[in-house]
């Protein structure tokens, strides 16, 4: 079985499901403007042999998870959801208590910059006001996908204080860069988190940070470094399909299937499926 640990649904801004009007996210970036539906994702998955995928609602669309959950219900067994919630909303403490009771809801996706009205928080991961939030998610067993970009080091205090909280580092903690080295500027900070057993990494978007054609050899050393530090049972494959501009969905999968010689068959089973199933408590 192959599980894709992240894709974004891009659906229209409608009166029934409006996007928030905060200045930082009132509309998506231009490259995201076209629709990407669950049906399109199913077609892409079928074409390369991916069995199921995790829907991660995009940040600029707000905290309305209803359409993602509806897609998971419509295509049962194919999709589940890592939803969004505003940690600064006064209603959030009560909502967290029942978060995982929502059918197909697996956890929460967090951004470090939180463009919430009336206060825009530039570094939510380091905000002392959210200590209650990390503690609640730890107590309730809610996994958190953390969009750290180049700020992996900001997870260190959270991991130290909350050893039973599952923290999933998104996209190898990379950022856009002119070179692979620039994109992986936070690599050492990410590796430093490997000592915490509940910290895992989404690894599949390495090709998007490469500046070479397939098989993207300029990022292989980083992928090997993650493998050596975290091990396959803490590596989750994903392609982030809506972000692909220089490579294809098939190439993102093929790289891990064929071109990383250090991976064993058991490693691939973990990376393609079992690690996501365990980290997100999403059994077959």
Predicted features, each with a name:
Residues 6, 45, 68, 99, ...:
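Conserved, mostly hydrophobic/aromatic
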Residues 1-3, 14-15, 20-52, 224-225, ...:
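Mid-to-C-terminal alpha-helical segments outside catalytic/metal-binding sites
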Residues 2-12, 169-172:
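Histidine-centered catalytic micro-motifs
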Residues 122-236, 284:
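Catalytic pocket-lining loop regions of alpha/beta-barrel enzymes
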Residues 25-35, 81-89, 117-123, 179, ...:
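Active-site mouth loops of central-metabolism enzymes
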Residues 10-13, 60-63, 88-91, 115-117, ...:
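Active-site environment of divalent metal-dependent phosphoester hydrolases
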Residues 51-52, 61-150, 157, 200-206:
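Active-site gating/metal-coordination segments in enzymes
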Residues 34-44, 89-100, 185-186:
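Short, acidic/polar
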């Amino acid at each position: 079985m192959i599980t894709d640990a992240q894709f974004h649904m891009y659906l229209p801004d409608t009166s029934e499901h409006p996007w928030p009007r905060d200045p930082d996210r009132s509309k998506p970036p231009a490259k995201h403007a076209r629709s990407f539906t669950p049906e399109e994702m199913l077609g892409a998955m079928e074409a390369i042999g991916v069995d199921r995928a995790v829907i991660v609602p995009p940040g600029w669309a707000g905290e309305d998870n209803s359409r993602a959950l509806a897609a998971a219900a419509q295509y049962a067994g194919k999709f589940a959801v890592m939803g969004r919630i505003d940690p600064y909303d006064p209603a959030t403490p009560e909502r967290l208590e029942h978060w995982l009771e929502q059918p197909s809801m697996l956890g929460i996706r967090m951004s470090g910059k939180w463009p919430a009205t009336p206060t825009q928080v530039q570094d939510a991961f380091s905000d002392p006001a959210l200590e209650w939030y990390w503690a609640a998610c730890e107590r309730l067993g809610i996994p958190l996908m953390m969009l750290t970009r180049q700020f992996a080091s900001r997870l260190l205090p959270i991991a130290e204080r909350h050893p039973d909280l599952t923290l999933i580092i998104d996209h190898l903690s990379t950022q856009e860069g002119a070179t692979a080295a620039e994109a992986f500027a936070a690599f050492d900070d990410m590796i430093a988190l490997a000592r915490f057993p509940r910290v895992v990494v989404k690894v599949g978007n390495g090709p998007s940070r490469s500046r070479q054609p397939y098989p993207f050899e300029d990022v292989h050393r980083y992928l090997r470094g993650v493998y050596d530090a975290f091990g396959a049972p803490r590596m989750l494959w994903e392609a982030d399909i809506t972000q692909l501009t220089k490579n294809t969905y098939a190439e993102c999968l093929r790289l891990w299937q064929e071109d990383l010689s250090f991976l064993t068959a058991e490693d691939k089973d973990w990376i393609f499926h079992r690690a996501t199933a365990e980290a997100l408590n999403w059994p077959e």
